[in-house]
Amino acid sequence: MFAQLDTKTVYSFMDSLIDLNHYFERAKQFGYHTIGIMDKDNLYGAYHFIKGCQKNGLQPVLGLEIEILYQERQVLLNLIAQNTQGYHQLLKISTAKMSGKLHMDYFCQHLEGIAVIIPSKGWSDTLVVPFDYYIGVDQYTDLSHMDSKRQLIPLRTVRYFAQDDMETLHMLHAIRDNLSLAETPVVESDQELADCQQLTAFYQTHCPQALQNLEDLVSGIYYDFDTNLKLPHFNRDKSAKQELQDLTEAGLKEKGLWKEPYQSRLLHELVIISDMGFDDYFLIVWDLLRFGRSKGYYMGMGRGSAAGSLVAYALNITGIDPVQHDLLFERFLNKERYSMPDIDIDLPDIYRSEFLRYVRNRYGSDHSAQIVTFSTFGPKQAIRDVFKRFGVPEYELTNLTKKIGFKDSLATVYEKSISFRQVINSRTEFQKAFAIAKRIEGNPRQTSIHAAGIVMSDDALTNHIPLKSGDDMMITQYDAHAVEANGLLKMDFLGLRNLTFVQKMQEKVAKDYGCQIDITAIDLEDPQTLALFAKGDTKGIFQFEQNGAINLLKRIKPQRFEEIVATTSLNRPGASDYTTNFIKRREGQEKIDLIDPVIAPILEPTYGIMLYQEQVMQIAQVYAGFTLGKADLLRRAMSKKNLQEMQKMEEDFIASAKHLGRAEETARGLFKRMEKFAGYGFNRSHAFAYSALAFQLAYFKAHYPAVFYDIMMNYSSSDYITDALESDFQVAQVTINSIPYTDKIEASKIYMGLKNIKGLPRDFAYWIIEQRPFNSVEDFLTRTPEKYQKKVFLEPLIKIGLFDCFEPNRKKILDNLDGLLVFVNELGSLFSDSSFSWVDTKDYSVTEKYSLEQEIVGVGMSKHPLIDIAEKSTQTFTPISQLVKESEAVVLIQIDSIRIIRTKTSGQQMAFLSVNDTKKKLDVTLFPQEYAIYKDQLKEGEFYYLKGRIKERDHRLQMVCQQVQMAISQKYWLLVENHQFDSQISEILGAFPGTTPVVIHYQKNKETIALTKIQVHVTENLKEKLRPFVLKTVFR
């Protein structure tokens, strides 16, 4: 019977449409018993192909297509792994090929268990190679020209399922080669997956011996994977068990904990670790963290359930004492649930590459590798790649892809988005392109590297998996699942920027204050830091900077570190429903049900609410006599909602509880309660470790706010300026002679850096810093290299006021810039002037300057216009920070954003405003009646007095606005001769609604009128429209 060997899969990137799952399905439909894959150079899909075949009752045949140079000729070879030995040889051959190291000698040394096929298209009778081979023939091969001494074998290339797929593959080739469809060669026909019986009949008729050769070749093929654990040996000169025991004992003695119950707990953990064969694993993790600390890196407090291990604490893998804080080792590791311990290593993100190099050098480049991932055609990428080849312009592509949501597939967005569907259906070619995009959506596009994963092995990795070359170290061809399934140690090196922040803060405190802070010794009950959490002042604090967490902190107002840990756990779906109960019970306003005195100590810290997975385990242990290992199995069954397992566990729980003298009714009720909480209960060990890191960050914010904001602004991409301003920091005006490159904070002043100026070349910024001081605008421009004498680079420097120290009129410098550049370039020539003749002009307003600064660097650096308005104001108003709930107040603010909605009942419009008074933000609501009155006045960025009632919602003050009044003092003045054109002027003004009051002065009768019903948005277009009817317009 025919077997399909030469099938290219989607892992021959953009050269096939054969995905594995559909391949199995179609192969069975077409009557195949044996199928193969033969991707070019790589084995990315090999493991999943073999396992998938076995699951689907198909015989897998693993192949590999390579080209190899021999006697100055590239020879195309198809290789077939005939058995497990051949499979391992392919791993090595593919690795050599994907590393650029494959040569004929190496190839010939690795042919045991491999059959070689040379396709008839690449064969000639002049070809002489140092190995035996078959000649692969298809339906179109002229058999009369074949070497009669060589064995023939049926070999048919498959790249798609049906002829209809040829157009899609043509598109993939165009995308791959970055060509238009017209420039891309047509796809070969007859490469679809054909019916097995038809092909068998064809070869039986035309080439029966070849068919027999194929049957003989594949008949005994079978692959066996070695799934045994292959941990590297940490130290071949000493027993890992003894070394781990020595190190942990020394670690506890160093911490002053060589006493009970620590000694018993340590022995218990060491026995389990040794029995499960993980001694080397702990030593490897210890070694990696030791390396980081030897470099002075802050490695954090640990993460996940590993924080429940005393061995990990003794080795300084974690920074949490699990005995003191009642954390469970069995949640991490127990003999009743055999699985690899999972210690993810957090490290400062800026040093991750150094850890990779250490692993490579310490354990060997053949024994360690990063892990591959596959980037796929997402819906937006598929649309963009395909529609581009249909000639769709960029602006149309952008508009179309904007309609695709983050979680959308092409099918779902087409179904739910009317506008998307209308675009697709508007043209025939769009419908065709969309069909192709849907066909390739989800297919691999290229390889990438796992963000965290590293694999290590005791022997060469290529004995188990294929590799390819990478920048810092080798990269696996198998994904993380396949790597672990082959018994290899996968570890996650997680670059955590918060560790970088903490380390940099520690270093800056030492530099600026001469104070050496031991981060791990920070008191987790520090009153000042606890107060910061209680206020919800946690912008920039790991795990607590989102609005949901901030609001939760304001409600809970944690009074001790344990309540911060609880807040982490309550800030989750399900658990958050019990926040009110938690608070009321803590305040004595609600009865605490502890169910049974024997489990009261477990539930008391969380006021009778099961917040943590460990509580479920402890209750099972204390109430029903379960071992902690068995209790962990119960927890897992509950969290995974394994009904069959849970039913069995429930009966066991009830029987064991009754055996201990518990009432059956109480036991059943308790089990149901445990079952409910286990679904969303949090890992307490993880919550504790990450809350400790959050507390350490918050400690710096509470005690050294200038250091905190300096580091956050320079090492984080997020915006912390607003938060700093709310904490009474001020943005300082800088000059060309003082501006730093990165942001700097000194004495509550924020000095914005040159790095914030969009589009400013870094080299130019460095040149400015190296060349200063400058004496004048002319001096600066004279010394500026010609390549930087461009308005696109110079104008932003002028607009943000860097030359105010020489000439405070920014508009004047801008208007003279062209002349200045001519002047400085002619300076010294025969016809040059000795000094520049400036042309005067009116400067920007305070508001305009502030807006330009915001636009260019993201924040205003000069005096805020609102402060100017406040200083001149004759009206009484209250700062946002002094507002009191359930009171009437007037605030002077700037509108940041306006969100308009329609009410569900009447369908009328209302608005939500986000406003600020330069120090604090406030949410403002305008209900339909007020919004209808003031909607024409409201504009983002403008200044207003708002009067209203202060309410509290979600522990945040907000205003229900009753009155709106413009705060800006500028007006639009019109000078007209008489009343002749009043109607035309009124009509024009009405077409430019805004927030600026209008005053008309009539020259003939010296009459001045302030318009009460018209306010405008002043633009050049408005000025042009008015020109025929007025003598002059002035905005001041």
Swiss-Prot record:
One annotated GO biological process: DNA replication
Gene encoding the protein: dnaE
Organism (species): Streptococcus pyogenes serotype M1
InterPro entries: DNA_pol3_alpha_NTPase_dom, DNA_pol3_alpha_thumb_dom, DNA_pol3_finger, DnaE2/DnaE/PolC, DNAPol_HHH, NA-bd_OB-fold, NA-bd_OB_tRNA, PHP_dom
SUPFAM superfamilies: PHP domain-like
Similarity remark: Belongs to the DNA polymerase type-C family. DnaE subfamily.
Keywords recorded for this protein, A-Z: Cytoplasm, DNA replication, DNA-directed DNA polymerase, Nucleotidyltransferase, Transferase
One CC-aspect GO term: cytoplasm
Signal peptide: none
The protein's name in its UniProt record: DNA polymerase III subunit alpha
